[in-house]
A protein has these predicted regions:
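Glycine- and acidic
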Residues: 1, 26-34, 63-68, 116-124, ...
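Active-site phosphate/pyrophosphate-binding segments
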Residues: 1-96, 101-104, 189-224
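N-proximal short alpha-helices
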Residues: 11-14, 18, 22, 111, ...
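Helicase-primase coupling helices
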Residues: 65, 71-157
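Short alpha-helices
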Residues: 129, 133, 144-195, 202
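Solvent-exposed, flexible loop/coil residues
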Residues: 45, 57, 75, 90, ...
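Short acidic, glycine/serine/threonine-rich loops at helix termini
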Residues: 42-45, 107-110, 164
């Protein structure tokens, strides 16, 4: 809610995404929470960013066909499925970490397995410490390989902090719409498909759409 735009987190989030997309070719944005309780935030953000900013025309009516592709992931699970691509693959991604300073529950890794140095070094550490160390390692690997990334840190995961995060991301999406010069508050592409579905199912008032649908010649499809 800061008035000074350079200190406004919502505007900073939007401008970082916009500039890296339009000047550095970062066409994919990855949201990577290192807390299972924040997993649904990345799922929700994927929907928010995609349908708000993926547009064919801008506010002046120009055909622009723009929008970043949002990808959701989960740390540390996806270190073993996606991170290889982000660290060494195409230079087309921006990674946004989500982390929390405090976990509601934590477990200390017990002593044991002294004869197995590959795991015994973990004794005495907490699971939270292990998870956040994994995050730091991933972050470092991205930086060393010149992959842009950012971190949003919550004090803890509760209704207050998550509510603020969701609101910030919503405002940021509106800011991004202004930067891209598109309407971030409609989804004409979604409505286009819905209208054909209504027509085919016989909803009243969509007779013209049904005729249009039936007259459309689609290329033959092969079943593999």
């Amino acid at each position: 809610s800061k008035a000074e735009i350079r200190k406004n987190p919502a505007y900073l989030f939007a401008s970082i995404h916009y500039l890296l997309d339009t000047t550095r070719g970062k066409k994919i944005t990855v949201m990577l929470p290192y807390s299972y309780r924040l997993k649904d935030v990345s799922d929700w953000f994927r929907q928010l960013w995609a349908e708000s900013l993926g547009k064919k025309v801008d506010v002046d009516g120009n055909h622009v066909h723009l929008g970043q592709t949002p990808v959701n992931a989960l740390g540390a699970t996806d270190q073993h499925s996606q991170i290889q691509l982000y660290v060494e693959g195409p230079f087309d991604k921006l990674v946004c970490f989500l982390e929390t300073e405090k976990f509601n529950a934590d477990v200390t890794i017990p002593e044991g397995f002294e004869d197995h140095p590959g795991i015994s070094y973990l004794s005495g550490h907490t699971m939270a410490n292990l998870l956040m160390t994994e995050k730091s390692g991933t972050e470092h690997a991205l930086v060393i390989n010149h992959r842009p990334n950012m971190t949003i840190r919550l004090p803890e995961v509760n209704a207050n902090s998550v509510g603020q995060l969701l609101y910030m991301l919503e405002v940021s999406t509106a800011f991004a719409g202004g930067l891209y010069r598109v309407n971030a508050f409609d989804q004409p592409g979604v409505e286009f498909g819905k209208q054909y579905a209504y027509a085919v199912m016989g909803k009243q008032g969509f007779e013209k759409k049904k005729a249009e649908f039936e007259q459309t010649k689609l290329p033959p499809r092969k079943v593999l």
